[in-house]
Amino acid sequence: MKVFIVIMIIVVIFFALILLDIFMGRAGYRKKAYEPVFSKKKSDIELIHCGADLVERMMNDIRQAASSVHMMFFIMKNDEVSHNMYTLLKTKAQAGVSVYLLLDWAGCRAIKKTALQTMKNAGVHVHVMNRPRFPFFFFHMQKRNHRKITVIDGKIGYIGGFNIAEEYLGKKAKFGNWEDYHLRMIGEGVHDLQTLFASDLKRNTGIELGSDVWPKLQQGTISHKIYATDGYSLENIYLANIAQAKNRLTVCTPYYIPSKPLQEALINARKNGVSVRIIVPMKSDHPLVREAAFTYYSELLDAGCLIYRYYQGFYHVKALIIDDHLSIIGTANFDKRSLFLNEEVNVEIDDEAFTSEVYATIEEDMKKSELLTMEDFSKRTFRQRPAEWLGRALSYFL
């Protein structure tokens, strides 16, 4: 018995030290967090919600690149889809195009070192970000650059939720169809995507891009602004967005693990007469995230919020839609990791026609979703409850 008590004390102390490391690391990191909110711009913006279409469009644009290809992804892997992209990047680098590829340490661990080295040998500037380091080792282990940005010749930009791997094209039976939203942008906003890429490159490598990668760009037709977050400002931005809602709002997220203020903001919006819809996946791609989400649903259902669970594949969309004019689409999930740890980027689009297109896409998603009722919620087995509360307890790190 004494041995067991000693072991438990050691375990408690160990986890307490980990938490102390993470929270002290986060407090210290705040001074160098990069969270720009760019001024309003006008661009031509296209919504893409099919992974195969996205990769085809992106690769076609890269094939036409004349001067530069700047790509930043959270996840790329050791599969055919990823290797097709690696081959194209190598081809462009060998043709004299300046090619940079930024990858997150946690997200790119499936890539073989030989693949990275082969790209480097071909002239691709490959850099891995957010490697764990001291001090605050455990904090840095939790940091993720979750941004997905591609800028081609400084004129064409891509940003959104898709990564580059087979499952994002619906080629993994485990997930089936993969629903996500990505944006293709031409116009002034590409300048801001390039600035964000250049900043992440400099902060992680010390390398500065030349001024020639910011060509003069023409205005497009859709008003928008781009903002990046680094674990500190996203919660307040979302709270301000939700407070604007007068008639309806829709949250699309693969992981519904909000902060307490955001949960309360949605409930208050519903109490004030705003229609609140939340779309989440039926299945899960990570342990405990679905279980953690269930601990928030009772309050939402009691308030009259509608929760739809997408069942025709996996739902990875990151979007917040306010009334009939505001669409926020990007890389940030509606969870604590995106709110308080990750480096993210969103595009806030103020345009009725574009928002109408987004709503039409969401309506199609809802046809492939099941409405969660309080009766269904109450039928959860008691065996599920411990996993739910374990997920809730660990929600900051899921």
Swiss-Prot record:
Q: Which residues cross the membrane?
A: 3-23
Q: Which residues form the PLD phosphodiesterase domain?
A: 141-168, 311-338
For this UniProt record, the keywords arranged alphabetically read as follows: Cell membrane, Membrane, Repeat, Transferase, Transmembrane, Transmembrane helix
Instruction: One GO cellular component term, please give it.
Output: plasma membrane
Name the principal localization, coarsely classed: membrane
> How does the entry describe its membrane topology?
Single-pass membrane protein
Give GO terms: molecular function aspect only: cardiolipin synthase activity
Q: Where is it located? A: Cell membrane
InterPro entries according to UniProt:
Cardiolipin_synthase (IPR022924), PLD-like_dom (IPR025202), PLipase_D/transphosphatidylase (IPR001736)
Q: Which GO terms describe its biological process?
A: cardiolipin biosynthetic process; sporulation
Effect of gene knockout:
Cells lacking this gene show a lack of cardiolipin.
Q: From what superkingdom does this record's organism come?
A: Bacteria
The family note in this entry says: Belongs to the phospholipase D family. Cardiolipin synthase subfamily.
Describe the function of this protein. Answer: Involved in the biosynthesis of cardiolipin.
Task: Give the PANTHER family listed for this entry.
Answer: CARDIOLIPIN SYNTHASE, MINOR CARDIOLIPIN SYNTHASE CLSB
Q: Per its record, how is this protein called by name?
A: Minor cardiolipin synthase ClsB
Q: Which gene encodes it?
A: clsB
